[in-house]
């Protein structure tokens, strides 16, 4: 009789748990990003959303709005903060001075690759995101494969050659570097690069290789430095109130999809896409893809040293020790074998 009672009680418990799961309030999360649906990051976002749907037994649906449908690329952090969207893809480098800690990632000659480098970035930035992005719920961060500088009318070999050029910088730190070299910055999100180059508003742009082809930038550029100069960090954030409104089991699902492992999964196809673009552009007639010699590369590295000093000052203003932050980043990159 005791065994029967225990069996009945177990069955009732299972039934109640199943009923509770079935009655869990379904939620649809609006996810906005600014790259076109042909971009590999979009496909990775779709796979991420499908995994969330499956893990939540259908109680969380993720609806994705690509290509700046809901707002400009520069506005995506505020869109998540203000509840215009539930999840957004943020490029912190599009807002100079606002996120100085994560700006360490933008310093030249730091990252060797975008795959393990993304797992390292996410692992490192989790220790600081709560302070720097405190008005949103941090999910994960990653980076593209290293990018370089591309020019429309002038072959640039040495930093001194940048003087007088108009450059679309990929992020805030590179913008500071270009200013120190005597160039003028022209702000434009990635989908707008071709337009500013074609109209002569800019003479050069920072971009990873595959994105050149995706946005048609190779059609208006001719000279390309064949050296990995920089990366730009990308961050996914959630609206705080929306995350707080989720049930405990739904929060668990989201937490399991906001990890360094997922950062790598999202970054990997993008990294492959970007690195593959280099050989395609190099094979095109009329394109000059040229390496930097040892002395030339040393000159570029020397020219970037003041940029680090400016970054350090911005981190001090944010109340952090820049040496500790930078050493932490370097160590994490080394742990993931992804440092320059």
Go through each PLM region and give its residues.
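N-terminal secretory/targeting leader peptides
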Residues: 11, 23-116, 124, 131-340
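Bacterial N-terminal signal peptides that target proteins for export
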Residues: 1-9
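N-terminal signal peptide c-region/cleavage motif recognized by signal peptidases
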Residues: 17-20
